[in-house]
């Protein structure tokens, strides 16, 4: 009898698990399929709420530079996915918290920026969200908020009494953003130590004023996010939710969004659509499938099918580059970048969308040394590096090797006031007379 009971009970548990799985909300299901989902404070309850109605969720972004780089793109793609499934994203641009600086993952105190510079950065960063997110449908259009609106107006004594009383030093010392710095005997300012409380307060403000039920962030933000859900529970006796995405690890071991040329910026005035396209085109073979799920809108099942059927990894890289560039810069820019690459690499021609180096016509009349051309435009950092590259036959002008370090650039090198400068196999520039 006991064996029969055990058999029935086990099968019942399996059926319940299957039912729960099929009931999972489509937004959260796709989060999992794309690899966006790392941790959640209460996944079942959040799924249940999302099945019943649309929600608002937010992600916070520091405004320490004029542009976000591609390391922030996964978070923006999650906001875009929220819209796809009928939910409303809130973009928190941290005009207040950027005055402090998030210590997470940092070895030292960040450079403190003036409010005027932060405001300029916010204005510049906002352009990217308006390009990637859909602003045309009122129900799911992004809400932009700046936490300076409430953080800069706080009364210190009142804040300590009403908010600070809900946090213990004991618990705050256990969070990685604090613990790692202290374990390494690196200084952590009182200002930075307060960052996690301010982030929790942000969530409370958005919960109270915007009915925001969900905060999303990278896995390094888990402690800060949980602080927010705890504060909301203590202040309102209601439940809010936190969700993290995994930190992106590259097969090469390098950091996402950083290359030998510098950061891969999202703003067009800091990185051309062609260079952006090339970044994705040069993805490590081992990362292509993951990046197709992370950074394109192609359905996950379709990606699996494409990856199974298409054996040419370079065609998959072009697909990735086209889709990622389309999302940020538009369809025309993606097509133009692909055609430029084709003209440059396959046809031996000069692509129209290559990064440009402009030289004054008077310099050409006098003649400019090849060494100066390369070093002044920071293609390589020193003339000694340029000399070594020339000795190794690393430079070409219009596909002809430059083998003389004393070469002088003059009008004979130009065709219709331009020429193609190549360094190695993957770096190409359009040198133009102005």
What are these regions (language model features)?
Residues 17-219, 229, 236-241, 254, ...:
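NTP-dependent nucleotidyl-transfer catalytic core
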Residues 156, 190-203, 225-228, 273-276, ...:
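Short runs of predominantly hydrophobic/aromatic residues within well-ordered alpha helices
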């Amino acid at each position: 009898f006991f064996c029969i009971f055990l058999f029935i009970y086990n099968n019942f548990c399996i059926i319940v698990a299957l039912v729960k799985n099929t009931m999972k909300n489509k937004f959260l299901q796709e989060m999992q399929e794309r690899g966006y989902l790392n941790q959640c404070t209460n996944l079942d309850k959040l799924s249940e709420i999302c099945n019943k109605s649309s929600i608002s969720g937010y992600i916070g972004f520091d405004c320490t530079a004029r542009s976000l780089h591609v390391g922030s793109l996964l978070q923006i793609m999650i906001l875009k996915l929220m819209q796809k499934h009928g939910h409303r994203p809130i973009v928190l641009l941290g005009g207040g918290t950027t005055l402090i600086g998030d210590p997470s993952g940092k070895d030292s105190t960040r450079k403190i920026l003036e409010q005027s510079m932060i405001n300029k950065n916010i204005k510049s960063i906002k352009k990217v969200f308006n390009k990637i997110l859909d602003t045309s449908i009122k129900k799911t259009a992004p809400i932009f908020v700046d936490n300076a609106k409430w953080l800069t107006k706080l009364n210190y004594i009142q804040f300590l009494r009403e908010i600070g009383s809900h946090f213990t030093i004991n618990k705050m010392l256990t969070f990685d953003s604090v613990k790692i710095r202290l374990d390494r005997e690196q200084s952590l300012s009182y200002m930075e130590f307060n960052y996690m409380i301010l982030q929790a307060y942000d969530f409370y403000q958005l919960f109270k004023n915007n009915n925001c039920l969900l905060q999303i962030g990278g896995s390094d933000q888990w402690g800060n996010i949980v602080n927010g859900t705890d504060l909301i529970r203590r202040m309102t006796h209601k439940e809010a939710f936190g969700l993290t995405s995994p930190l992106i690890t590259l097969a090469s071991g390098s950091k996402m969004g950083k290359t030998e040329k510098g950061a891969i910026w999202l703003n067009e005035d800091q990185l051309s659509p062609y260079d952006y396209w090339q970044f994705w085109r040069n993805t490590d073979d081992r990362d292509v499938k993951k990046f197709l799920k992370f950074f394109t809108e192609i359905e996950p099942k379709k990606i699996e099918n494409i990856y199974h059927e298409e054996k040419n990894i370079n065609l998959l890289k072009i697909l990735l580059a086209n889709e990622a560039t389309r999302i940020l810069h538009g369809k025309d820019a993606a097509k133009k970048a692909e055609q430029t690459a084709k003209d440059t690499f396959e046809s031996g021609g000069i692509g129209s969308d290559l990064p440009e180096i402009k030289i004054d016509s008077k310099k050409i009349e006098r003649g400019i040394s090849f060494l100066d051309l390369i070093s002044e435009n920071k293609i390589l950092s020193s003339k000694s590096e340029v000399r070594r590259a020339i000795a190794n036959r690393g430079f070409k002008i219009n596909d002809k090797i430059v083998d003389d370090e004393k070469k002088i650039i003059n009008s004979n090198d130009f065709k219709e006031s331009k020429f193609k400068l190549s360094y190695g196999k993957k770096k190409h520039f359009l040198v133009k007379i102005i």
